[in-house]
Amino acid sequence: MSESTTAKPTKKLYIQTHGCQMNEYDSSRMRDLLGASHDMVPTDNPEEADVLLVNTCSIREKAQEKLFHQLGRWKHLKEAKPDLVIGVGGCVASQEGDAISKRAPFVDLIFGPQTLHRLPEMIETPRENGAVVVDISFPEIEKFDNLPEPEADGATAFVSVMEGCSKYCTFCVVPYTRGEEVSRPAVDVLREVTHLASQGVREVNLLGQNVNAYRDDSSGEVIDLAELIAAVADIDGIDRIRFTTSHPMEFTESLIQAYAEIPELVSHLHLPVQSGSDRILSAMKRGHTCLEYKSKLRKIRALRPDISFSSDFIIGFPGETEADFAATMKLIEDIGFDNSFSFIYSPRPGTPAADLPDDTPEQVKKDRLKILQTRIIQQAQEISRRMVGNTERVLVTGYSKKDPGQLSGRTENNRVVNFRCNQPELIGKFADILIEEALPNSLRGVLLGSELDD
């Protein structure tokens, strides 16, 4: 009589991700890692998960409270299922590890951005004397050596090329939560991109907190971001390259020249400036003036007249006057930004700016933010209207969120385009779309042709 065997039930993983694209990338690598080590499958329902992870961001105000609200919602799940594993990762974990373990003692794991590769071992580590497992150290970028090959999810992918930041802007916590700048060896980056391309990825976004500070000298020769982009462009299957997020100080002449020499580099750039006032830029310790910033963008636009620019703005930094804000608005007009991530300044504990006196009334900050965001929306709509009548090359990424009868994709300048089509095999391919209508948050067009016609 043969022995019957019962397969172990598949364990399920739920990850809540807060914050930036680096966190999105890290969360995807956690899924790959625990899928490889524990055969875990992702779920969108936290109530059916065996492992709950929250990947946190500490950039904005109330990040800690957002985390504890999330953990409060999960506490009852832990009470109903004692074997449930709850973990906190990301930048808030790096910054507030002790506070998390004290306020939420039911949390099992606390890990930083540089130690996520140790998750399989942390999950298996039994709690000793009721203590949480904590690993928020900054090992020298070893996590990439311990992660499995990435699994592609569609035609676009993020690829982290460096970690950390060494600029120490007075408002920013990143150097304290992710550590100093460390670049991955170019050969490792190219291997990852090649693997993704073999799975059908057509567009990669090279990531780093200060990505244009990328420097790899592991082979004896220095490879900068411009050279890395050129090497990525040579990989079969890769047709579009983006990079995020940049610092104006590190925007070298070779990187500017890449816009003339590398057609795969898209005609869109996100380059944070934070303020148009030299006085505020100095107080932020940004290391450049407004004129120096504009000069770089004008050089790029001379090489790529159709390029679009987006940026980050902090409103109400301590001491910001009406004149400072007016300088920011003038910069917005001069450049013609068509998108922004703009927020009212919130002091981050442990940063130099947190000690500066803040005497600007809250309502004034809110009014300034509304003025800035309204103008950038107007500029974006003007750019979208100018695109009507153009034929745009669109990378089709899936179905429209609002209409399953339409496919959706993005232009080089990061516009969402929806068009009616009954060819699902077009997903992951490039299509030529005649833009017929500009809507507030997207464009609508008709299909003229695609790679399927070749």
Swiss-Prot record:
Residues 11-128 form the MTTase N-terminal domain. GO terms for cellular component: cytosol. It comes from the Bacteria. Binds 2 [4Fe-4S] clusters. One cluster is coordinated with 3 cysteines and an exchangeable S-adenosyl-L-methionine. [4Fe-4S] cluster 2 binds at residues 165, 169, 172. Its EC number is 2.8.4.3. It catalyses: N(6)-dimethylallyladenosine(37) in tRNA + (sulfur carrier)-SH + AH2 + 2 S-adenosyl-L-methionine = 2-methylsulfanyl-N(6)-dimethylallyladenosine(37) in tRNA + (sulfur carrier)-H + 5'-deoxyadenosine + L-methionine + A + S-adenosyl-L-homocysteine + 2 H(+). Its cofactor is [4Fe-4S] cluster. Keywords: 4Fe-4S, Cytoplasm, Iron, Iron-sulfur, Metal-binding, S-adenosyl-L-methionine, Transferase, tRNA processing. InterPro entries: Elp3/MiaA/NifB-like_rSAM, Methylthiotransferase, Methylthiotransferase_CS, Methylthiotransferase_N, Methylthiotransferase_N_sf, MiaB_methiolase, rSAM, rSAM_horseshoe. Monomer. Catalyzes the methylthiolation of N6-(dimethylallyl)adenosine (i(6)A), leading to the formation of 2-methylthio-N6-(dimethylallyl)adenosine (ms(2)i(6)A) at position 37 in tRNAs that read codons beginning with uridine. This is tRNA-2-methylthio-N(6)-dimethylallyladenosine synthase. It comes from Saccharophagus degradans (strain 2-40 / ATCC 43961 / DSM 17024).
